[in-house]
């Protein structure tokens, strides 16, 4: 079985090392980094992953490079780990090199921001492509040294995937067999891809905290940070409360989707419940969203995206962060669009989205161009 991983970032690196612990899996990594590719080509391409208990797992992927034809040759599965804003260009780049003589299972980890719609649009006419996505990353990964080492944080107890509505039961069965072969945690199949699209995650979490840190009336609205801080260990009370409001609105979108489409999306649970089920005893105090975020050991030490203040002392939020370009420009934009079409009211999400677009000034704004124009009517 050959797995091609697109992206040599934290998730791509960690998955490559973990997959190669299984001798029956051929792993190729397609990267845009000429440095990482050259290091592998020189023979010095041993990748490492440091586990939470201090063990070091090592592996050398079978291919690491910038050539999509080499990376995708005879691939059975393609895992896309790039952020949402990079996925359209990537799919266009790899499309000509996908095998045509067998089924190819193309999935995104995680599969949020409407990946099923994006992939179906870019890869239209390719009947052998099976589109799927994973609800969340299987593990937290951080402290990446590109092409060398990454640290592995908390792991999900169970993994959940969904396929595009067009896919067959036979394709679903084949996908599940493949995923349960390459992942240690049990993999479960969801009924509808909207269960992934509406999973409460980064599109709710990071923007809510950003707004509470630097939005209107926030402590750092008009001054830089004195020191680095962590997304979750240092999450302010206001951020947790705003996140709860956004999560309630996401549930309203879920209920409206169920009513309009006649489907069951009950697996889309409130965020606090999702986190408790995902991280269990790694959470020190799960009584409130605030205490949960600050005491989840799987989240400990994850830094907020701060960079040196170009206008003086201190630190400021990095405008190049995925929190803006992925979670807001794609994740929140999609939720706002879905809410409008479903006539669901989402004042907190819309408030953050409008503020972030104004604050940043250079975000892709409006409905992502791959959302079907006739959704939800034609769904």
From Swiss-Prot:
The keyword Transferase does not apply. It comes from the Bacteria. One of its GO terms (molecular function) is oxidoreductase activity. InterPro entries: 6-PGluconate_DH-like_C_sf, 6PGD_dom2, NAD(P)-bd_dom_sf, Opine/Lysopine_DH, Opine_DH. The keyword Nucleotidyltransferase does not apply. Keywords: Plasmid. PANTHER family: BLR6086 PROTEIN, OPINE DEHYDROGENASE DOMAIN-CONTAINING PROTEIN. This is Uncharacterized protein y4xO.
């Amino acid at each position: 079985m050959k797995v091609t991983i697109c992206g040599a970032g934290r998730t791509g690196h960690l998955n490559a090392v973990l997959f190669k612990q299984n001798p029956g899996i051929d792993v190729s990594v397609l990267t845009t980094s000429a440095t990482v590719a050259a290091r592998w080509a020189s023979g010095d391409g041993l990748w490492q992953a440091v586990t939470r208990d201090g063990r070091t797992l090592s592996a050398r992927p079978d291919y690491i490079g910038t050539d999509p034809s080499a990376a995708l040759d005879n691939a059975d599965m393609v895992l896309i780990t790039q952020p949402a804003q990079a996925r359209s260009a990537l799919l266009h780049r790899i499309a000509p090199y996908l095998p045509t003589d067998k089924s190819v299972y193309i999935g995104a980890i995680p599969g949020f921001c409407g990946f099923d719609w994006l992939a179906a649009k870019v890869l239209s006419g390719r009947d052998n492509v099976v589109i799927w996505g994973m609800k969340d990353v299987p593990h937290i990964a951080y402290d990446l040294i590109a092409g060398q080492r990454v640290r592995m944080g908390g792991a999900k107890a169970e993994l959940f995937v969904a396929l595009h509505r067009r896919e067959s039961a036979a394709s679903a069965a084949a996908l599940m067999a493949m995923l349960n072969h390459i992942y240690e945690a049990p993999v479960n199949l969801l009924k509808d891809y909207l269960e992934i699209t509406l999973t409460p995650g980064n599109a709710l979490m990071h923007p809510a905290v950003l707004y509470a840190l630097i939005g209107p009336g926030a402590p750092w609205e008009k001054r830089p940070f004195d020191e680095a801080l962590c997304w979750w260990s240092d999450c302010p009370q206001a951020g947790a409360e705003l996140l709860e409001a956004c999560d309630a609105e996401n549930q309203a979108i879920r209920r409206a989707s169920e009513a309009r489409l006649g489907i069951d999306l009950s697996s889309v649970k409130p965020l606090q419940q999702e986190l408790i089920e995902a991280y269990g005893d790694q959470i020190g105090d799960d009584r409130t969203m605030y205490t949960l975020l600050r005491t989840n050991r799987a989240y400990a030490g994850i830094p907020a995206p701060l960079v040196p203040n170009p206008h003086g002392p201190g630190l400021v939020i990095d405008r190049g962060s995925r929190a803006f370009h992925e979670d807001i420009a794609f994740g929140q934009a999609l939720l706002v669009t879905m809410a409008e079409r479903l006539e669901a009211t989402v004042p907190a999400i819309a408030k953050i989205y409008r503020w972030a677009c104004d604050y940043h000034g250079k975000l892709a704004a409006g409905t992502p161009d791959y959302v079907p124009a006739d959704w939800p009517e034609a769904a």
